[in-house]
């Protein structure tokens, strides 16, 4: 008999075989495991997970979820110790050969669900069919029936007993369901899908790649966006550049992130006229540095790779800097460093909370050592802001955040938040592999891996990011100017 511990979470959709969400504030018990297949499950033996919450509401963090369609693959003479959202523990014992299903005495009503299904006419009268997509010629029909209805009774029980009703951090009444169901990811940061799902996705992809749909995307690129993972079309503003089909996080421009975080009509930009003057006269055979700067300025409408300014976040005055990867890969040159430095100095003088949203490929090589100097310059003013003035700095890492930004202000936040699936590293995967002649483990530079190693404080989806940052500011005594503006 094998025994396994796992945290149980259930939303109003089908249980998904995915991985973990994130950590936040309230301590949740660790996950333990004795023996189970490594290929079937994702687990972490040493990790404590956390959850955002208020007095009567909470979010669970999940290290292990099992799909209902995969249940027949693991219910062979195993006892599972289950911990529900209220931290109550109980056991479920399956014996597929003897068709036994046992629950401890505290959950006798779950047994009632199971035996009700087993005695139903549907179970007794169901016949085998070659057209049944679930039919497996190598598994006896009786075993399939037993497994199917074990899953059904568990499904019914948890639907009726486990619910999460908090509307914290979101304006939507269904925020928790979407938070839990849509943002559960695997350890590698990619959504797992079954063989049938892949076939369906490929067919769907071929349809979406038709000339008609591509024309729609080109003609309405301000309204619609195409996922670069599954090629599905989505309404840009409503979905926050997150694919509703596969959960893939697409890049956002700095203007889109400002719109996401800052209250309408409160944004006041700073140093918009600051432009790089090619300080080291960088020579390039392909394209002069000045010409390249001009082309990106026309393409993005920005003067350089960062926007800085002040505004209100749910009524709270903040100083905000947002890097834009579309401008030369978000590289940090003298202008980027100077604008961020001036923003921090302004926040220090005005005693404002500081938020920096990072998305960068690192220091800008066209400016040589001047770009590297920005790392020390920004870190120096941050030291005064944090250590001397005791003010609050939140660093938000998006994909990708690498190089000099990671090595300086990106990882200096009092609170370091990352988006799901974000690629965060100092040296890129290709550079490491070429230097060390060793393969970099898949997912080792993903936000989820860094969270487990303690390099991040939380992984927060876009739809809850504004609420999380607002709550953090209030915890550090930064309150809205108008209490009615707090949502």
Curated annotation (Swiss-Prot):
Alphabetized InterPro entries for the sequence: AcCoA_carboxyl_beta, Acetyl_CoA_COase_Trfase_b_su, ClpP/crotonase-like_dom_sf, COA_CT_N
Zinc finger feature spans (C4-type): 227-246
Name of a matching Pfam family: Carboxyl_trans
Protein residues bound to Zn(2+): 227, 230, 243, 246
UniProt xrefs under Gene3D superfamilies: 2-enoyl-CoA Hydratase, Chain A, domain 1
Cofactor names: Zn(2+)
Cellular location(s): Plastid, Chloroplast stroma
Molecular functions per Gene Ontology: acetyl-CoA carboxylase activity; ATP binding; carboxyl- or carbamoyltransferase activity; zinc ion binding
Keywords associated with the record: ATP-binding, Chloroplast, Fatty acid biosynthesis, Fatty acid metabolism, Lipid biosynthesis, Lipid metabolism, Metal-binding, Nucleotide-binding, Plastid, Transferase, Zinc, Zinc-finger
Coiled-coil positions: none
Its EC number(s): 2.1.3.15
Catalytic activity as recorded in UniProt: N(6)-carboxybiotinyl-L-lysyl-[protein] + acetyl-CoA = N(6)-biotinyl-L-lysyl-[protein] + malonyl-CoA
Main location: plastid
This protein's name: Acetyl-coenzyme A carboxylase carboxyl transferase subunit beta, chloroplastic
Origin species: Lobularia maritima (Sweet alyssum)
